[in-house]
């Protein structure tokens, strides 16, 4: 999926995550994370976001995530929504997403 514009999903409420996805001039995926549980779960959150991007066939993006204790399912849902918005895609392939076994 080609990232065309900046898009945001989520909120800064407790147990949520705000994720911003933008085009990346460096042609790589870069993930910046701000989390109160960085030491315990930072690597896991980054891996989860990265794997979701790979599953969505995103090859280049700048991702900024602010985590407020979100569960894995919330992190994935927010990432999926932000990527679709940033790509200008309004149709979700639920069969494909379901095949990820999340």
Swiss-Prot record:
Cellular component terms (Gene Ontology): cytoplasm
Protein's recorded name: Citrate lyase acyl carrier protein
Biological function: Covalent carrier of the coenzyme of citrate lyase.
Subcellular locations according to the entry: Cytoplasm
Transferase found in the keyword field: no
Keyword NADP listed: no
Annotated organism of origin: Streptococcus pyogenes serotype M3 (strain ATCC BAA-595 / MGAS315)
NCBIfam families, sorted: citD, PRK13253.1
Family of the protein in this entry: Belongs to the CitD family.
Pfam families per UniProt: ACP
Modification type O-(phosphoribosyl dephospho-coenzyme A)serine: residues: 14
Keywords assigned: Cytoplasm, Phosphoprotein
Quaternary structure note: Oligomer with a subunit composition of (alpha,beta,gamma)6.
């Amino acid at each position: 999926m080609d990232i065309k514009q900046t898009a945001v999903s989520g909120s800064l409420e407790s147990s949520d995550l705000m994720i911003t996805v933008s085009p990346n001039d460096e042609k790589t995926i870069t993930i910046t994370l701000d989390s109160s549980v960085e030491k315990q779960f930072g690597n896991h959150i980054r891996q989860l976001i990265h794997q979701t991007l790979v599953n969505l066939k995103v090859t280049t993006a700048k991702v900024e995530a602010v985590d407020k204790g979100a569960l894995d399912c919330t992190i994935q849902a927010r990432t999926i929504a932000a990527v679709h918005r940033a790509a200008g895609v309004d149709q979700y392939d639920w069969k494909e997403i379901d095949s990820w076994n999340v």
